[in-house]
């Protein structure tokens, strides 16, 4: 039975970025400036022994429910689900979800961005839709279903209905997600100011394909020409200085499957350095749009 939210119940904004390594953001000593995340860390808590599964669906199922991914039947990504217990991708209703729990306790709820927890064979318009966000306690869903999407021509769903992205050469999905999240947050403040909200914001730009705006990629021109071996050394030094890792921490040996930077020819170095620039531009743009959403909350 639903309850009214307690007086003074806080609004909640939960953000999950995608494929952002421990050493990527400046918040944890990385080479990519993420001022929004830096600010959150300075005014909140920063964990350095937090566990993820390093896979989309399992990590997301665990965060969404507070339960181990095998309990959620999501031991692997949904596309690789099997019929075995813990791996069939059919997240049980007994797991509950943050959306459902908070909705039952008087919150308005919305999800913006990536959902990689719908079983692969249930993602069409034939349904069923009982594992889509709108069936997990989220009154509003605007985003995409699956592991990735084109950022200029995304496969968007509003609820369970597919919608077309605007035919605009300046359109970008990451900015669009932020726009929709901001609009919803402002609506909550104007239409239901006495009712708390829970917004789950899950951008997917830092997962391939890395379709970052050109102007954001350009910000990192030449920043990674030193190569990945030197980058590892510089990152570890920053992490030690920040206290993210203990003093005296040593780099693990470079995996044999990854060649040394110096063994690459000039064309390969140019390509790989540009790939790093593109990823950096992607993360920086995500951080910028997260900042826009947080600013709307603070308003």
Outline where the language-model segments fall:
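Formylglycine-dependent sulfatase
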Residues: 1-299
């Amino acid at each position: 039975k639903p309850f009214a939210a307690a007086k003074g119940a806080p609004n909640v904004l939960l953000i999950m970025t995608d494929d952002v390594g421990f050493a990527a953001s400046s918040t944890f000593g990385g080479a990519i400036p993420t001022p929004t995340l830096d600010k959150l860390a300075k005014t909140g808590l920063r964990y350095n022994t937090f566990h993820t599964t390093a896979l989309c669906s399992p990590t997301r199922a665990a965060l969404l429910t507070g339960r181990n991914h095998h309990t959620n039947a999501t031991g692997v990504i949904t596309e690789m689900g099997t019929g075995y217990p813990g791996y069939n991708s059919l997240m049980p209703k007994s797991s509950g979800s943050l959306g459902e729990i908070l909705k039952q306790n008087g919150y308005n709820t919305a999800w913006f961005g990536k959902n990689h927890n719908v079983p692969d064979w249930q993602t069409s318009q034939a349904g069923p839709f009982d594992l889509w966000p709108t069936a997990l306690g989220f009154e509003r869903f605007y985003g995409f279903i699956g592991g990735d999407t084109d950022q200029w021509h995304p496969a968007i769903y509003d609820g369970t209905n597919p919608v077309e992205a605007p035919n605009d050469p300046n359109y970008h999905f990451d900015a669009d997600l932020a726009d929709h999240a901001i609009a919803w947050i402002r609506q909550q403040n104007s239409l239901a100011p006495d009712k708390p909200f829970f917004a789950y914001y899950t951008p997917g730009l830092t997962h391939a394909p890395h379709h970052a705006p050109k102007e954001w990629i350009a910000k990192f021109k030449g920043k990674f020409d030193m190569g990945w071996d030197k980058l590892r050394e510089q990152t570890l030094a920053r992490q030690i200085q920040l206290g993210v890792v203990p003093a005296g921490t040593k780099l693990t040996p470079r995996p044999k499957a990854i060649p040394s930077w110096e063994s690459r020819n000039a064309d390969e170095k140019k390509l790989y350095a540009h790939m790093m620039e593109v990823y950096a531009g992607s993360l920086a743009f995500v951080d910028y749009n997260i900042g826009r959403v947080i600013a709307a909350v603070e308003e």
